[in-house]
Amino acid sequence: KVLNYTVNLFERLGKILPVHIIVGNHDIWAKKSNEITSIDSLKWIPNVQVYTDPIMYNWSDRKILLMPWRRDSAHEAETLADNPQSEIVFCHSEVRGIYLNSKVKNQHGNESNIYDKYTRVYSGHIHYRQNKNKLLMVGVPYQLTRSDMNNPKGFDLVDLETMEETFFENHISPKFLRYNIKMLYDIPLGNFKKQIENNFVDLYVPSEIATTSALSNLINKVQKISRRIEPNIYQEDNMIDKDLYDIDEIE
């Protein structure tokens, strides 16, 4: 079913515009080889190209390097060195010092300054969208786990002539949200329902409230609106993570 949907999607895209796909590490069967990939089925679709090896294009009078996943950081550095004329790079790279989530940095790969000489570099691989100097980690198009909370997801449109970038945020796919029930008392229920619709919700509840009817009443009113709502009971004296009280999404 998934393969059928994917092929159908790229068939439709191929009828609209040329599609260029670089292989990522989750697409390959062997850890250090791009020879066998899960997206080989797409390469037979008209107007769709799948790249397992680097290739250089001249688009809008700019040298564009498409660099799929390399077997290690040394191989990646070698590929970049072999294409010194590149101006813009589209890649799937592991970069040291890039955030994996809001708090943890990646400790593997090349340093980000390896890309400083380029006009712009767009990379996948790291799910957490972020910008560092010339490098844009585009992230995943939708939230996958709680680690993606509050990190914008979507896709980018780049004008290669002007290098103007337009980000289209994904407001359709489910998101992970976090609320504290004490902060909801003065919020209209309709507003709360609208925000949690189709989303995954962590609801933090002080133990003294969990034993009252307030929690069950709220759950009964909203549980069919969200994808899932999970109450998390805590002892208020032990609550030291101030982030749990942040409900800036509510207006």
What are the roles of these predicted feature ranges?
Residues 1, 18-25, 49-54, 67-68, ...:
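Active-site neighborhood of phospho(di)ester-bond hydrolases with catalytic His/Asp-centered motifs
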Residues 13-15, 80-84, 112-117, 195-196:
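Short, conserved loop/helix-junction motifs that constitute active-site signature segments
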Residues 6, 24, 64, 125, ...:
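Divalent metal-coordination and catalytic microenvironments
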Residues 1-56, 114-118:
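Core catalytic region of metal-dependent phosphoesterases/phosphodiesterases
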Residues 59-113, 182-185:
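Binuclear metal-dependent hydrolase catalytic cores centered on His/Asp/Glu-rich metal-binding motifs
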Residues 96, 101-167:
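Conserved beta-sheet core of the metallophosphoesterase superfamily
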Residues 160-251:
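Accessory, non-catalytic peripheral segments of nucleic-acid enzymes
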Residues 47-49, 62-64, 86-89, 103-104, ...:
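Active-site regions of enzymes building and remodeling cell-envelope glycoconjugates
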